[in-house]
Swiss-Prot record:
Dioxygenase that catalyzes the cleavage of the aromatic ring of 5-nitrosalicylate (5NSA) without prior removal of the nitro group in biodegradation of 5-nitroanthranilate. It comes from the Bacteria. PANTHER family: 1,2-DIOXYGENASE PROTEIN-RELATED, CUPIN. One of its GO terms (molecular function) is dioxygenase activity. Keywords: Dioxygenase, Oxidoreductase. Its EC number is 1.13.11.64. This is 5-nitrosalicylic acid 1,2-dioxygenase. Residues 85-151 form the Cupin type-2 domain. It holds the Pfam family Cupin_2. It is an enzyme of class 1 (oxidoreductase). Signal peptide: none annotated. It catalyses: 5-nitrosalicylate + O2 = 2-oxo-3-(5-oxofuran-2-ylidene)propanoate + nitrite + H(+). The keyword Oxidoreductase applies.
Length: 207
């Protein structure tokens, strides 16, 4: 099929419908299995890194059958992201939001999930959800680590170039999650960091 591209945009093409449908038909995904011990091991490895003491401890569980090109391996199934998160006792993941819907399955630990000002306590084997673009924060209030699975429709939104993230809370931190947009991902506050920040706030109030 001949076509002209006088303006010189090499990524802009016209193709025959048959070729288009060849691209639409993808390979099916194979069944996958991820051992819980391996997931925990990955989280513990992050925990050993001193640079991660105040970072979000998070591993993504991916299927290499999912996605194409640069989006290959961004989901556990087409459209869905799955990860596992570790929060230490006394730590807080401060308020943030994203336009992906989130589902959480608590494996270990106790604490609180705050969504738009409403506080919900959690314990092992609870299932919790957070609507899209809702501010939410986590606090591990128990004496054991919090371990939880997190499932988002993030992979679908990323593929559509429609994923937005605000972290930490503040309109200046809203990011369109595409290349060239700076993202902020590290937002777990260690207890001692929280106290330091609180002291700074008191000093500001006294000025």
């Amino acid at each position: 099929m001949k076509w002209s591209n006088k303006d010189g945009y090499p990524w802009s093409k016209i193709i025959h419908a048959e070729k288009f449908f060849d691209k639409v038909i993808q390979n099916d995904t194979r069944p996958g299995k991820w051992e819980w011990a391996d997931v925990v091991s990955g989280l513990r490895d992050l925990d050993k890194d001193p640079r991660m003491n105040s970072e979000r401890r998070y591993v993504a569980i991916v299927n290499e059958d999912v996605g194409l090109g640069e989006t290959k391996g961004i989901g556990i199934t087409p459209g869905l992201f799955c990860g596992c998160q570790l929060i230490h006792p006394g730590e807080e993941v401060t308020s943030h939001r994203h336009n992906s819907v989130a589902l959480y399955f608590i494996v270990e630990g106790t604490g609180e999930l705050e969504v738009e000002g409403e506080v919900y306590s959690y314990k092992p084997f609870d299932i919790m959800t957070c609507p899209a673009w809702s501010y939410h924060a986590w606090r591990a209030t128990g004496d054991k680590d919090t371990l939880m699975y997190v499932i988002h429709d993030m992979a679908l939104l990323a593929y559509m170039r429609a994923l937005f993230w605000e972290e930490p809370k503040g309109s200046e931190n809203i990011r369109h999650m595409v290349k060239g947009s700076t993202h902020t991902w590290s937002n777990t506050k260690a207890p001692e960091v929280s106290k330091t920040q609180a002291a700074k706030e008191l000093l500001k109030q006294g000025e």
